[in-house]
């Protein structure tokens, strides 16, 4: 015999919890985004995503499974006609939870749960563009390195000594500049 899950239920009883999630899912599919408590939003996410997965399949059997949960036929029609086909090429991740300010009165942590409206094709195109740019950048970089190596090869020993002297002079100036504020503070004391 299957044992019931342990722990608190939303609404107190199993039937009330089912009703709460059915109503939340109906509102989510009807409006696209809803504000609720953070714990209800986290519990609603897998529930709603399974319904969207049924809508993606689009068969009569899947429609009847969704109608067992969502009683509003207009919302079910919207789910199967618009939402399901919209996510046809997306594997999961149909909802997003955004935490908001706590509720006034009881200070309960609140969140917005919404259907993700961005297509994954745009993100894939951006990723492909970045990959192509990163592949083009290393191809251009070795050519620049060869130029630098050629210039370094042409430098004479005298030029190298002059460069070392310039570097030492710059280091001396920065050290003196760093000591200057300390000297001014000592004069003030």
From Swiss-Prot:
Instruction: List all membrane-crossing ranges.
Output: none
Q: InterPro entries recorded for this chain?
A: Ribosomal_bL17, Ribosomal_bL17_CS, Ribosomal_bL17_sf
By its UniProt entry, which PROSITE patterns does this protein fall under? RIBOSOMAL_L17
Pfam families in UniProt: Ribosomal_L17
Q: Which GO CC terms are listed, alphabetically? A: cytosolic large ribosomal subunit
- An example of a Gene Ontology BP annotation on this entry? translation
Q: What are the protein's UniProt keywords? A: Ribonucleoprotein, Ribosomal protein
Q: Which Gene3D superfamilies match?
A: Ribosomal protein L17
GO MF entries? structural constituent of ribosome
Q: At the top level of its lineage, which domain of life is listed?
A: Bacteria
Query: How does the record describe its quaternary structure?
Result: Part of the 50S ribosomal subunit. Contacts protein L32.
The UniProt entry's sequence similarity note says: Belongs to the bacterial ribosomal protein bL17 family.
UniProt cross-references to PANTHER family, sorted A to Z: LARGE RIBOSOMAL SUBUNIT PROTEIN BL17M, RIBOSOMAL PROTEIN L17
According to UniProt, the name of this protein is Large ribosomal subunit protein bL17
**Organism from which the protein derives:** Rhodococcus jostii (strain RHA1)
């Amino acid at each position: 015999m299957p044992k019931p899950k342990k722990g608190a239920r939303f609404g107190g009883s199993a039937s009330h919890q089912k009703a709460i999630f059915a109503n939340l899912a109906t509102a989510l599919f009807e409006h696209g985004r809803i504000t609720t408590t953070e714990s209800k939003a986290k519990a609603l996410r897998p529930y709603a995503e399974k319904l969207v997965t049924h809508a993606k399949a689009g068969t009569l059997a899947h429609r009847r499974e969704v109608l067992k949960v969502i009683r509003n036929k207009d919302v079910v029609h919207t789910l199967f006609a618009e939402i399901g086909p919209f996510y046809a090429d997306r594997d999961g991740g149909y909802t997003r939870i955004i935490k908001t300010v706590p509720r006034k009165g009881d200070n309960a942590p609140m969140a917005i749960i919404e259907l993700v409206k961005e297509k994954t094709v745009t993100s894939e195109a951006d990723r492909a563009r970045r990959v192509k740019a990163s592949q083009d950048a290393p191809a251009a970089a070795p050519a620049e390195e060869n130029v630098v190596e050629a210039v370094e090869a042409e430098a004479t020993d005298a030029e190298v000594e002059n460069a070392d002297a310039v570097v030492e002079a710059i280091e001396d100036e920065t050290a003196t500049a760093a000591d200057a504020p300390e000297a001014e503070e000592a004069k003030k004391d």
